[in-house]
Amino acid sequence: MAIKKLLIASLLFSSATVYGADGFVVKDIHFEGLQRVAVGAALLSMPVRVGDTIGDDDIGNTIRALFATGNFEDVRVLRDGETLIVQVKERPTIASVTFSGNKSVKDDMLKENLEASGVRVGEALDRTALTSIEKGLEDFYYSVGKYSASVKAVVTPLPRNRVDLKLVFTEGVSAKIQQINIVGNKAFSSDELISRFQLRDEVPWWNVVGDRKYQKQKLSGDLETLRSFYLDRGYARFNIDSTQVSLTPDKKGIYITINMTEGEQYKLSGVAVKGNLAGHSAEIEGLTKVEPGELYNGTKVTRMEEDIKKLLGRYGYAYPRVVTQPEINDADKTVRLNINVDAGNRFYVRHVRFDGNDTSKDTVLRREMRQMEGAWLGNDLVEQGKERLNRLGYFESVEVETQRVPGVADQVDVTYKVKERNTGTFNFGVGFGTESGVSFQAGVQQDNWLGTGNSVGISGTKNDYQTYVELSLTDPYFTVDGVSLGGRVFYNKFEASDADLSDYTNVSYGVGSTLGFPINENNSLRVGLDYVHNDLSDMRPQVSMWRYLDSVGVNPSVVGENVKSSADFKANDFFLNTGWSYNNLDRGYFPTKGTRASANAKIAVPGSDNEYYKLTFDSASYYPLTESGKWVVMGRTRAGFADGIGSKEVPFYDNFYAGGSSTVRGFQSNTIGPKAAYYKCPANLVGSGFNSYSGCPIDSTNMDDAVGGNAMAVLSAELIVPTPFISDKYANSVRTSFFVDGGTVWDTNWENTAETLKAGVPDYGKATNFRVSSGIALQWMSPLGPLVFSYAQPVKKYDGDKSEQFQFNIGKTW
């Protein structure tokens, strides 16, 4: 016992050694206090083994080694004869980790940070680490302006040397900026400078960017904004001397003072480009031209550097170094730009790889590549491949990396990392309006069938007035050169009278095929043939309908009022279709920049029962207002025109319509434009030699049924904004926009007669009867499929128009 006490004293006070100069030989090692840690694991962590001769240094190393495992709070080493006794106190095991009071920081983020610090369920608790964790979390709150915040770790002991760990947060309130002072500005007012900041001491109601809540990171960004503002206006000697952030005694107010030196404005005296230009000096000099007397501009200097890097990157110089050293002449207030360029090595591409395409086949991605293996690297070609993959619409995100090949000086591998989205959808649409009630439609579409890139779809509608089924198939790479082949088969039974359209029934079916030919990266042409059969019956006498029938030589007999004509009409038509498409959108879903446009034409070829042509145009352009693409303006234009050939008219069943979620939101589908003007022939005239509807009066009591027209124009403008309360993780899956829609449909062949004027029928030949609506839309690419909601209120409407304020579509995705 005396030996044990003496050994403890020597370890604690290091005043003497009990082992003598030669130490002693360890015959056995015995542990006391082990519970969770196995004896074998403890022995492996020690530098001492049975049979070793040890001294004071070995004992010290043993204690340090055991502490280094992180499993023990206390370690003592004692000697009992030739047995080494190791007494330990294990750190308690964490049984649970909980949080309380944290509103600004999510539990998942806290757990992730704690685990990075070694604090997780099932691990030993290091009490010393809790202090630094508390301080680190409090520092985070201070950085976002919550200076009264506190974080306390509460450890509750449990049986079997376990503990519950609970972090208790008292967040407090964010300190608000009371005043921002700028000292040293002469050329520009403080108000003008502060107006460019995110942090503000005053925020008007319309400013959705400004913030009075102090955040250290935002202040750093505002200081950089201030620096760039002056450097872009020629103040080459501008400097921020100091920044003071003062806190009020109650920790609820912040005063910010920025001390700066403006200096004088400097002009550019010239640009000198030196170094290894890889034989592209003429092109580089063209990128660095400046006008005589031009003010120094920091942003322009940065742009020059980036342009030089992009230029060299196009020729395979993947890692050029471009450094600009401004040579400032204070005497004449000029700056000479010395641009040093080192193009570095030129690289070949060894492999182009794809990662993350679990469904899509490699060939589907590889055929979109413009950067070839074995060729010189071209950064523009690599980026072009990324854009083309994004444009497919198969992927939620596409990233690209260029990595050097180890041990090879002039080769790189290009890897595209994709995150696939669900491209198969079973969807149905629902609409609700005060006049229309509820309507439904359904469809199945797989845009990347079995990962082949082929599109297969079947869509259908079944309701009170329509039974419609369509099967479609498109192979975008029917040939290796990118010629596409598409086809469709459809069947449609349509009872227009039940759809608030003019009275008739049409049973139609058809088949069609289209070939597409790429012209360049963004343009393509297509040509196709269609066959369509239409079987019309139950046609109620109506002005534009009877005008068409008369043009094709069908003259129904006159019947009395409230009796439908017994006239039937069948048409077999063959159409030649041609079209042009342009697309340079940055991605297929939720684009932020670029334009998509298409123009199409179809004409009935000889041998058809009808003779007419139809033209359509559709264009949508996106203009980002911010570099992040969170604020975007979108404009869309749709137009159409159709006309008969010779004395023939356009079939009334192939008219243009507008209204609904795809054209003018806020209006019921297809209800904008000309309405039916039904003939109402008196019964006493029928059968008395009266054989023409032209002399019958018009029923002025029933003019609400839409008939469409042969011309259409629809305009839309949308402001796409960041969706509130959505984290950056889901920002690419949700889109919110405010919109204004406008559109009209008219009949260029309409002529008012004495009877139509008497009945008060409007002039349906006018193109100026524009309908307008405004509202808000929300689109969400949810795990269950695409969800689209819109609420719109008609701003300008006409008699007979039918509103449908709330519309949404719901889809199920596999």
Curated annotation (Swiss-Prot):
UniProt protein name: Outer membrane protein assembly factor BamA
Q: Could you tell me the gene encoding this protein? A: bamA
Question: Which InterPro entries would you find in this protein's record?
Answer: Bac_surfAg_D15, BamA/TamA_POTRA, D15-like, OM_assembly_BamA, POTRA
Q: Which UniProt keywords apply?
A: Cell outer membrane, Membrane, Repeat, Signal, Transmembrane, Transmembrane beta strand
Query: What species does this protein belong to?
Result: Pectobacterium atrosepticum (strain SCRI 1043 / ATCC BAA-672)
What is the annotated localization of this protein?
Cell outer membrane
Q: Name one GO biological process term.
A: protein insertion into membrane
Highest classification ranks of the organism: Bacteria, Pseudomonadati, Pseudomonadota, Gammaproteobacteria, Enterobacterales
Q: Which domain of life is it from?
A: Bacteria
The protein's predominant localisation is: membrane
Job description of the protein: Part of the outer membrane protein assembly complex, which is involved in assembly and insertion of beta-barrel proteins into the outer membrane. Constitutes, with BamD, the core component of the assembly machinery.
What Gene Ontology terms describe where this protein resides (cellular component)? Bam protein complex
